[in-house]
Each structure stands twice: as C-alpha cells, then as structure tokens.
Amino acid sequence: LKRLLWQLYRMPGRQNRQLEQRCSQLYAAWGIPQGDVNAGYLSCAVGIACSTSQKLAIRKEILQAVSEQFDTSVAAVESGIRRMVDQLEEKPTPAWLAFKADTRLGSGKPTTGKLIYAVRDVVLRQKSP
C-alpha cells in the first residue's frame, strides 16, 4: 500500500505539480523558506494523503512512506514536521494564524496528523488555474 501510494503521488502530471505548487505557496505565506527539508516532508505526506479518500494511519502508512522516499527514519520525518510547527508557533505569521483558524486547528500546536490533513483540505479546496 505504501509503495502504491507513493507511486500515485509521484505520477507525473499536472495535478501533482499543482499540489506541490499549492503547498509551496502556502508555506511561503507562513514564512517557511523554499527548499526547507521539513516542508518537503510535509508536502510528501500531504500528497500521500491526497492520493486516497480513506483515512490513513499517520506513522505506519504516511510517515513510513515519506521516510522511505527521503531515505531516513519515521522518527526523523515526524521530528522534522514538529520542528517546523515549533518554528511557526514561536513566531506566528498572520497567514499561519489564519490557516489555523480556517482549519479549526485551535490555538495550540497541531499534531502532525491534524496538520497533514488540514493542509490537504486547504490545497484540495483551492481552484485550479
């Protein structure tokens, strides 16, 4: 399943490029520099979550597949995404605060799973150009 999900995510085509662009635009608005490896982990996880309508297990399915693609551990991927959240929470931009309000993530730090699915929902809602 993990390999299938990754293959679906990595399928060449317009939809995948649009997903990556939407994620990059969102992160840029949050103040995350382009090319940030932790943002790459999150984008990859969002792509996997977008590839199916079923709710996937965060560690066993999503983060495991991300770790395989980046040739690192699940713990490193999860820690990287958490560090990104810590950075955003330490100096929150108006765009980050608006994202949290829009997605009902609350005032505290979102969990990795909630963040993945919140980003997925936002990028899927955006209209295609």
Model-derived features with residue positions:
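Receiver (REC) domain switch/output surface
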Residues: L1-P12
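Intrinsically disordered, low-complexity regions in plant nuclear regulators
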Residues: L8-Y9, N16, L124-K127
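C-terminal output/effector regions of signal-responsive regulators
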Residues: N16-T72, I81, V85, E89
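C-terminal engagement/docking regions of AAA+ P-loop ATPases
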Residues: R59-I62, E68-F70, S79-R82, E89-P129
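Recognition helix of helix-turn-helix DNA-binding domains
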Residues: A75
